[in-house]
């Protein structure tokens, strides 16, 4: 099957095209779609709390339709049904003081402990619980259509499934029978289909062999107070992973100097790290117009291990905060030993801590980034933000991105999986050389 390629999308506001020459429709072969945004009517309506699901009303460290306090209250009835037995503050397992929280779900079919980080403790609590709920939903999603081939669904598919991320040795072809989930395109709101195994995240052992097909990972899996909020977070993660894959020192990746960070809302996070005797190197990855992506690398004077984090957002302050707090969270994750998927190499290096040798900083020499414009105009419309990000992804990949609601009988919060067929993604640090990673 030949994938349908999209022409470049016009920028549009609140679902209406602004380019008069293009109009308000897109043509893909025999398919015409109206620029209307995602269509959530295929799934039950879900909104946490009573906030307006179309408007950003909270802008302190993150952009949400409601505050972390209100989200925290709305989440309480769902903890027990999801199997979350505890929420623990692990901030001071490390010396940095950046709020980090764990949510424990012992019966998980993936990771039993999820971590959340933020610039405030309440936001970190919400982050941890929401990540755990994301996992619970992705573990239990059910298919909507059974045993059909891509050829059977060709009239309804808006993309080529061969463009999805495949497992090594994948046996996928257009004639193989798969189970499918309903999806919506994010710009035109058309119904399409996504392979169930491209959404499912479940590592439970089964008593039968299954041919390798699609990559099982959580890239693009996100929750929120409403579907649009979750979708925006998922799109930003997909765009972040593409930025990491496309980062080239001196071309798209540049050093962020200390004097530039001083003008950001995250200056205090850098001060906390340095007050603890550690250091953080920052880079800006300029891949997406109108979006800011940062990479952070945390080093310690007494620990031969580096830890990294990334963040992408339309507000550079939020992007930088996410990168720094993710780096701090990754170190606490290793210290606590809480994740089942931690590589043993981390602890081999931890075993050398008695040497008190400082981790080698990146050997890459980056040019200084131009000053970051830390004050950018606020955008209140959540649908507009989703449309802008989806347009950017579609223009880069040539294919309209998709969203699947992770739905099942006990689903309780808005959780979506966003897929961007044809977009190259990576989570490997572009600030480390292969030699350094092997050491």
From Swiss-Prot:
YcaO domain residues: 116-439
Gene3D superfamilies: 3.30.1330.230
InterPro entries per record: YcaO-like_dom
One of the Pfam families matching this protein, by short name: YcaO
Top-rank lineage group of the source organism: Bacteria
Name of the protein in question: Uncharacterized protein MT1419
Organism in which the protein naturally occurs: Mycobacterium tuberculosis (strain CDC 1551 / Oshkosh)
